Amino acid sequence: MNIRSFLLISIFTAISYLVVDGATPRTFAPSASVSINYGTLSTVFPSLYRRASTSSSSSSSSISTSHDSQPSTSSSSPSSTSTSSSSGTSVITASDVSASNEIISSSTNNSIHQQVSVVTEYVTIQPTTYVTTIFQYTSLASTIAAQSGIASLVPQTYTPYGGVKALIGILVGVVVGSVFLLAIVMVIARIWGPRLLANKDQNNNNEDLDSNLVSKDSEGTPQITYASNF
């Protein structure tokens, strides 16, 4: 292997590393270009898509009952009910006076406290089905855990084409592949070419030697002619 072939292979390796390393899945910023059309995620290169979901609910209730006995002064039984509500809290209070003037009051307090918890998921969208196999990716998009501690695989729907970078990548792949094939042919020709030429020259020399020997043998043989008289 000469210096030229070594340089060609080194250049090809470097270009291939840059191309493939630029195409491998990695963590991008949340501002990566991901277009959403009718609920379908579309991207050309691996992109990071951020989605957030909120969920919370908590409630508390309390019931209290009090009894107060008073001397009997009247036989009437009045009753009263009051209701008040403000900022998500409802308080219902009811009181009743029994025949024995024993005041029975009960109150119910229902309070709803909203506790909002935000879970942020980063979904890596990866394209697939490129023309050349150099740019083959996986067909699943992995959900990267942010602070939720959850990691799973979420299949997504996307389109693999639609950008100038993809076409440039395909052209670079074709050029790099052609250079690689040319380097292989040059190395094979450099190594095996002289041997093949030497074998061919040796075969030609052997054929010439055989033909010379046959001609010399025929020169020493007397020629016999037949004559007849009619």
From Swiss-Prot:
Topology in the lipid bilayer: Single-pass membrane protein
Keyword Phosphoprotein found: no
All ranges on the Lumenal side of the membrane: 23-167
Keyword Iron-sulfur tagged: no
Transmembrane portions of the chain: 168-188
GO CC term, one of those recorded: endoplasmic reticulum
Region called Disordered, residue ranges: 55-90, 208-230
Chief location category: endoplasmic reticulum
UniProt superkingdom: Eukaryota
Key words of the record: Endoplasmic reticulum, Membrane, Signal, Transmembrane, Transmembrane helix
Signal peptide: 1-22
Subcellular location: Endoplasmic reticulum membrane
Cytoplasmic membrane side: 189-230
Full protein name: Uncharacterized protein C16G5.06
